From Swiss-Prot:
It comes from the Eukaryota. This is E3 ubiquitin-protein ligase TRIM50. The gene is TRIM50. Auto-ubiquitinated. Acetylated by EP300 and KAT2B. HDAC6 drives TRIM50 deacetylation. Acetylation antagonizes with TRIM50 ubiquitination. Its EC number is 2.3.2.27. A zinc finger (B box-type) spans 84-125. The modification N6-acetyllysine is found at K373. Zn(2+) binds at C89, H92, C111, H117. The keyword Coiled coil applies. It is found in: Cytoplasm. E3 ubiquitin-protein ligase that ubiquitinates Beclin-1/BECN1 in a 'Lys-63'-dependent manner enhancing its binding to ULK1. In turn, promotes starvation-induced autophagy activation. Also interacts with p62/SQSTM1 protein and thereby induces the formation and the autophagy clearance of aggresome-associated polyubiquitinated proteins through HDAC6 interaction. Also promotes NLRP3 inflammasome activation by directly inducing NLRP3 oligomerization independent of its E3 ligase function. Residues 468-487 are annotated as: Disordered. It is an enzyme of class 2 (transferase). One of its GO terms (cellular component) is cytosol.
Length: 487
């Protein structure tokens, strides 16, 4: 036979009508309804009139009510092992079956009917329990959501910490490597300086040793002559007089006398003043710590029709006649410019350009998106950063406004150092590799790819036809290129 009633529903049917809890020591009245023994006794004590069944309102005799043994056995069978006994009211000794919503406390049925909680809104404990369980579940869910957020935050913090530690380890390794390289370079310069001083010293000492050896030889010869003359002085009078002139002439031989004024003090002049050691070494190291020169070539597709490229697209000069070249967006059609075939969008880069004895030239970098049609707008606002020479005497930086540059002499080789992330483009007088002299520095927020640009300027009827050259990275000293040939 299958059961049609669930356990929770069965428990509801086994509840006392007074305390609304599962029967405890159930008693059956004459009308057939059952109540907890404690509930029935408490109800009888508080009534002055005859006892009536709370369910059917039939008059009954509470003192003659018999235990409902069958119901008690069913309840005993349904009760799980280890279930705690229900708490009871301290006033009526009845189970705490109700919850006073006003006072927020557990009460028994009599407290709600006759006690201090009379007329207060009350709710069965099971209902309150279910409601509070739902509230607890909602609170737990909310806490889980907060815990999830905290877990995500912890994961982000751990990842951030791990990343910081890793980046710190990498940067520390880079610092150690860079300082090791600097120590190596300093040791090289130290050895170079000491070797130079040692060589200079050895030359001076060798010269002095030679003079000292000659002087000592002269001294020995003079001592020998002195000894001979002293012995000659012991001769008898006649012999002394006869030989005196010959002996005196021998003592006066030029090779036996040191030359007057033959000694001239030699000064130690190594070509390096003590106070300038750090500055001189720094100038040498500065070039070594710059990036290796870039092996650049020129891009024929960008060259103005008057420009002639040669030597593997490393030499450019402005010719007298325009060449037939396809008109394309990347080609300059007015300004005599040409770009390098490779641009830079990050990192540190160094390259050099030989300008020789040209009277007019410009060079620098240009944004890849800058217009190449019409006259070139030479200003940082238009994505062009240049310096140049005009009429063989005026050096200027094409900033806003233009900045005259106090350049000493006429450098034949210009070095360019680009630090993309730092937003710096610095130009150097690179005629002396060990003594790069800064000419000007642009500060900018670079965006997009930058290309090295060379502007030969107009040929001026041949007076400014000398070429500009991208020298090979290992090229020693200023380059004097041959005359380029037309493409």
């Amino acid at each position: 036979m299958a059961w049609q009633v669930s356990l929770p529903e069965l428990e509801d049917r086994l509840q006392c009508p007074i305390c609304l809890e599962v029967f405890k020591e159930p008693l059956m009245l004459q009308c057939g309804h059952s109540y907890c023994k404690g509930c029935l006794v408490s109800l009888s004590c508080h009534l002055d009139a005859e006892l009536r069944c709370p369910v059917c309102r039939q008059a009954v005799d509470g003192s003659s009510s018999l235990p409902n043994v069958s119901l008690a056995r069913v309840i005993e069978a349904l009760r799980l092992p280890g279930d705690p006994e229900p708490k009871v009211c301290v006033h009526h000794r009845n189970p705490l079956s109700l919850f006073c919503e006003k006072d927020q406390e557990l009460i028994c049925g009599l407290c709600g009917l006759l006690g201090s909680h009379q007329h207060h809104p009350v709710t069965p404990v099971s209902t309150v329990y279910s409601r509070m369980k739902e509230e607890l579940a909602a609170l737990i869910s909310e806490l889980k959501q907060e815990q999830k957020k905290v877990d995500e935050l912890i994961a982000k913090l751990v990842n951030n910490r791990t990343r910081i530690v890793n980046e710190s380890d990498v940067f520390s390794w880079v610092i150690r490597r860079e300082f090791q390289e600097l120590h190596h370079l300093v040791d090289e310069e130290k050895a170079r300086c000491l070797e130079g001083i040692g060589g200079h010293t050895r030359g001076l000492v060798a010269s002095l040793d030679m003079q000292l050896e000659q002087a000592q030889g002269t001294r020995e010869r003079l001592a020998q002559a002195e000894c001979v003359l002293e012995q000659f002085g012991n001769e008898d009078h006649h012999k002394f007089i006869r030989k005196f002139h010959s002996m005196a002439s021998r003592a006066e031989m030029p090779q036996a006398r040191p030359l007057e004024g033959a000694f001239s003090p030699i000064s130690f002049k190594p070509g390096l003043h003590q106070a300038d050691i750090k500055l001189t070494v720094w100038k040498r190291l500065f070039r070594k710590v710059l990036p290796a020169p870039e092996p650049l070539k020129l891009d024929p597709a960008t060259a103005h029709p008057l420009l002639e490229l040669s030597k593997g697209n490393t030499v450019v000069q402005c010719g007298l006649l325009a060449q037939r070249r396809a008109s394309q967006p990347e080609r300059f059609d007015y300004s005599t410019c040409v770009l390098a075939s490779r641009g830079f969008s990050c990192g540190r880069h160094y390259w050099e350009v030989v300008v020789g004895s040209k009277s007019d030239w410009r060079l620098g970098v240009i944004k890849g998106t800058a217009s190449r049609k019409g006259k070139l707008n030479r200003s940082p606002e238009h994505g062009v950063w240049l310096i140049g020479l005009k009429e063989g005497r005026v050096y200027e930086a094409f900033a806003c406004p233009r900045v005259p540059l106090p350049v000493a002499g006429h450098p034949h080789r210009i070095g360019l150092y680009l630090h993309y992330e730092q937003g710096e483009l610095t130009f150097f007088d690179a005629d002396r590799p060990d003594d790069l002299r800064p000419l000007y520095t642009f500060q900018a927020d670079f965006q997009g790819k930058l290309y090295p640009i060379l502007d030969t300027c107009w040929h001026e009827r041949g007076s400014n036809s000398l070429p500009m050259v991208l020298p090979p990275p290992s090229g020693p000293g200023p380059l004097s290129p041959e005359q380029p040939t037309k493409l």
